[in-house]
Curated annotation (Swiss-Prot):
Gene name per UniProt: ddl
Source species of the chain: Shewanella oneidensis (strain ATCC 700550 / JCM 31522 / CIP 106686 / LMG 19005 / NCIMB 14063 / MR-1)
Protein name, UniProt field: D-alanine--D-alanine ligase
Principal cellular location given in the protein's record: cytoplasm
Catalyzed reactions per annotation: 2 D-alanine + ATP = D-alanyl-D-alanine + ADP + phosphate + H(+)
Matching PANTHER family: D-ALANINE--D-ALANINE LIGASE, D-ALANINE--D-ALANINE LIGASE A
Record NCBIfam families: D_ala_D_alaTIGR, PRK01966.1-3, PRK01966.1-4
Residues engaged in binding ATP: 154-209
Subcellular compartments: Cytoplasm
Family assignment from sequence similarity: Belongs to the D-alanine--D-alanine ligase family.
GO CC, one annotated term: cytosol
Cofactor: Mg(2+); Mn(2+)
Amino acid sequence: MSKINLLLLCGGGSAEHDISLLSANYFETSLAKSEQFNVLRVVLDKFGQYQTAAGDDCELTNNREIRFRDESKAPWPVDYVIPCIHGYPGETGDIQSYFNLIQLPYFGCESEASSNCFNKITAKMWFSALGIPNTPYIFLNQYDDEAIAQTQAALEKWGSIFVKAASQGSSVGCYKVDEASKVLGVLKDAFGYAPYVIVEKTIKARELEVAVYEYQGEVIATLPGEIICDSNTFYTFDEKYAKSSKARTDVVAQNVPTDISDQIRAYAIKAFKGMKLRHLSRIDFFLTADNEILLNEINTFPGSTPISMFPKMLQNHGHDFTQYLSLVINSQLAAK
């Protein structure tokens, strides 16, 4: 049986470029444990240029091959691609649209599902349409006096708010606001990251995460894990990835009643199926002191860094990541 030429595409143009490279390390290590794959790792830089790990400039053509700038090197045909890209253009659905156009099979959610989840406003509309509770919010489409007034009114009503760029990941362009004097500056900063902004009520709650993925034709939802931060600390981009981070994680959240855990997992599967996700996701929830469950967000290509929850939760559920990848890839290619 011939090996599968697998393109591991990583990097991208977002603030999460470097995190994507760390996740790609995990994928590369996992794929190396299987003899099925010839893996070519290619980095997509912030300017849309492709380069191999060996430093060769190249491009992915519509003939489904990697063509090198050095024409003495033969083109490398691509059978399958893993777009290990957090943020733009991976989780936004843009790169998937190109793969669809050139009929190149790929790992992960399809373009529309990715786009729907990445935009926080669209995602919340979907959550509500599916009957899944989520945090109270308003959304804004431009930085003007009306937006400032709406945000100040939300702060007065809710006491504390989060102002978030609607189309960013990993808490990029996301700010906690407790004082009216901070509204103008925070709104301006958030609109600097995206043309749409969402304002959410601050929820004092535990932050629980569920790995949801397809395995042998079944949608699996793991037991919820938990992100634990210091009191009143927001789990920012830096708090997630800085070496000095005081946040810690539990692969299985402690002291969550069984019925609450079951309901969280049921909501996670409902969101996965209802929004037509594919292969993998990490779905994040809030759990309040009185056991109110609120869906926070969906990550359609969750991180796989040494501190990331998705691979840990999958493994804790009894599944091997290499075998999981092999099953997904072989099943998809067999269905072509």
